[in-house]
Amino acid sequence: MKLGDLAVGHLYSLQAALIDLGQDPKPLFERYGVTPELLAHPQARISIPRFMRLGHAAIRESDTPAIGLLMGQQVQISHFGLAGMAAQCASSLLDAFATLVRYERLTSQNYRGHSSLAPPALQFYSISPYNNFNLFVVDSALAARAQLGQQLTAGQARLREVHIEFPAPAYAEEYENCFQCPVLFGQSANQLLWDPASLELPLVQSAPATYAQLMQLCERELEQLDRHRHIRERVEEIVSPELHRRLPTLSEVAEQLGLPTWTLRRRLHTEANTRFQDIVNETRRDLAITYIRDTDLALGEIAFLLGFSSQGAFQRGFRKWTGQPPGAFRRQYRQTLAAENTDERLGHS
């Protein structure tokens, strides 16, 4: 199971931030398989683990821990694809944000959740536990949305506060320079709290007819995306973010899918030859393997994310699934990957 992926438009702001810092992004991008051809492809996506590693490498090589804030300040509405172009034509800032939230899946898929809008709050989902690899993701997401608010209203929109889940990092003073409002750390959510009047501001490029046309295109793209997702994938999407909390029941998942419980049970059997509890167990197993293989999260952090009572319980479960302790599995995978990369470089030399 994948942790998710992003449209390559999300890399444009990282590219611009590095250039603004006097860095050439091309060698770094190519090291992570991000070529000019990939950046120009309309359907291209990059996995979230690769995005994390690329961002962390950019921080290290530019010596700029606050690079996520710089990324957000470099964002353009066009980076959000068709949904961004539709949002630009909305009648108000509130409608623009609602458009971006509704069609977020066109440019971003993350099993941890999706952004939400509950005026005056525009919220980015939690990606805790936090570490040096993922702070920049929250920074860039919130800074980008703040920047869009300014762009779409010709600088008139105002933030009241910014709330961030993780504790203040070493570069905390950079936040108020970026957001121009109080920034509170250690909060219950990652969110921008807008001045309510700002959300009613008209957009500088509002165009009702064009907005309606682009909304139809976005809706068509979303329907096509859903049409190609099997019932199992839709259940996994609901179950996955809840693994570290109380797991949803079959009836609760059915309600979210707009199906009677018996219909969901029947469709899982006939279309996927599986049961609801099997999906829960297999989702936990697949995510455990993905976290060990593709991230640098500590074992205790992975245990928390997957709802295990302790690190020891996670290690026992992982050994049962794979026949190896998680640490040994990770080391073996990394060694194999390093050997393959060495062979590939030798083959091109």
PLM regions and their residue ranges:
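N-terminal low-complexity or simple alpha-helical regulatory segments
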Residues: 1-122
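DNA-contacting interfaces and partner/effector-binding or oligomerization modules
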Residues: 112, 116-201
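Hydrophobic alpha-helical core bundles mediating ligand binding, dimerization, or RNAP-core interactions
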Residues: 55, 97, 142-145, 218, ...
